[in-house]
Amino acid sequence: MCLPGISGLSQKEEIKIMGKYFGTDGFRGEANVNLTVEHAYKVGRFLGWYYGQRAKKTADNPEGRCRVAIGKDTRRSSYMFEYSLVAGLTASGADVYLLHVTTTPSVSYVVRTEEFDCGIMISASHNPYYDNGIKVINGKGEKLEEDVIVEIERYLDGEMEEIPFALKDAIGRTTDYAAGRNRYIGYLISIATRSFKGKKVALDCANGSASAIAKNVFDALGAETHVINNHPNGLNINTDCGSTHIHVLQEYVKESGCDVGFAYDGDADRCIAVDENGSVVDGDLILYICGKYMKETGTLRNNTVVTTIMSNFGLYKAFDREGISYEKTAVGDKYVYENMSQYGNCLGGEQSGHIIFSKHATTGDGILTSLKVMEVMLEKKETLGKLASEVEILPQVLKNVRVKDKKEAQDDPAVQAEVAKVTETLGADGRILLRQSGTEPVVRVMVEAPTTEQCEMLVDQVIEVMKAHGHVL
């Protein structure tokens, strides 16, 4: 359905922050500060016990032995968290399969296509190297259910009875399972509908998980592959590279004369593209390009694309012009996927580059998104710049404001009064949105307006009010 107006959901409706430890994308924090090896061990203990209890209820597994796949990104701390999780899981009787350095979507793929009870990805996605996170994936390859997260948090806070240890031969086993990652690479290659021969493609792997996978895929499909930022050292993940520092890829594409470029984040669940001229093609534009193509080929289920409230107003105008319906959800690919599952929609995503193709995946997948963009370019025999030019993007400025307390900062009457003032100023020509980050002590202030200068001015007005009332760190 097409939602009226350009403000989408109300601010209260869009804020979905889970609990004390788990945010919109798992348990994330600075390593050894607010995410510790003790936390990881206890998460492992709980998951091994929880899925073991579920397994006991099945006729073919009376011993309650569950199977858990673990992947990690390239941060130095990922290894210590992996060891802690393995210790907790096996102490509770779970068998653990190590995928090693791999992407979040690969863990999801392995779990949902094999007999795993759950999967864990150790990553803080686009965050700096000193942060890390624990993402838990259920047996269907989806983000973990919120009721289970509540129980994990209760255990972390000591509100549950102590979990018994597995003894003797009930102690879990640990297995090297790099073969699972390799099977995922083969799956990605099988999705491509055409050879990429003759195409010069640049990949920015963010010195992260994509470094282990992306080049293999594009080389196998015949592309002339140029890879940058694929030498991780544990400390350089996302540092001046990848999807959050897209200018690096823009310059490289222009200098090297590539036909297209793709930038990933630390765990490669998102993708931002760069066209042949070095212009950015973000998640909104990718949704339009793929959505229009899927409508033309009769593969856009329900004739609907699922977006979030952060998507640009220009995207909705383009969808309206093409007769494509859309849904708006809270920010987070978790909520995009929930909508897709509930209503049977097959394409959804975020401006940040989390794109979900439900025919192939249950979570955002940066490398898969690259393949789908290549498919449209090849099938339509068009450059990416030409495909993206059909959308007139409204200027948008978003600033992340680090604050002492997210809720207090956003709900402050003075801040809300300033938001109302900006809303009145913009009228029907734009919008303002305040949103609390689900993973950081940050309030995001976003304005869309006729000019970038006006966006900057209005965003800064709101931030100044936050500063004046003592909210900003």
How would you label these PLM feature ranges?
Residues 11-87, 91-92, 174-200, 407-411:
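An N-terminal, well-structured beta->alpha segment
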Residues 260, 297-473:
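Phosphate-binding and adjacent anionic-ligand microenvironments
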